[in-house]
Amino acid sequence: MNKSILHTIIIYTLASCPYCIKAKALLDKKNVIYEEIEVSNLTQEEKEKFIKKSGGKSTVPQIFIDNMHVGGCDDLFNLEKEGRLDKLLEHQPKN
C-alpha cells in the first residue's frame, strides 16, 4: 500500500495514566497501528501545538484518527459503544 494514502492514528499519552492504558488497550484489541506520543517528552513548543491541536485540552489521552480529534478515553469508548469506532478504523493499517 502506498504510504501517502495510509490513514493514521495518533494518541498522546503519559506512561502512568490509567486512561491512556485503557485507550491503548482498546486500539490494540482493534488490531490497528497507532503512533504513541509521550507528552512528557515534548518540548514546550510541541506541548503548545498539542494543546492547540486538541482544542485547548491538555489532558491525556488525546486521540486523533486521520487528523480528526476524537477526544479522550471516554470519547473513544463512546464511539465503540455507539458502533461508530469500527467505521473510523476500517481503513487503518493493521498489526
From Swiss-Prot:
GO cellular component: cytoplasm
A biological process from GO: cell redox homeostasis
Span of domain Glutaredoxin: 1-95
S-S bonds: 17-20
Range of residues in the leader sequence: none
GO molecular function: protein-disulfide reductase activity
One protein family per Pfam: Glutaredoxin
Keyword vocabulary terms for this entry: Cytoplasm, Disulfide bond, Electron transport, Redox-active center, Transport
Subcellular localization(s) per the UniProt record: Cytoplasm
Functional note: Has a glutathione-disulfide oxidoreductase activity in the presence of NADPH and glutathione reductase. Reduces low molecular weight disulfides and proteins.
Family indicated by similarity: Belongs to the glutaredoxin family.
Record-given protein name: Glutaredoxin 1
Organism: Rickettsia prowazekii (strain Madrid E)
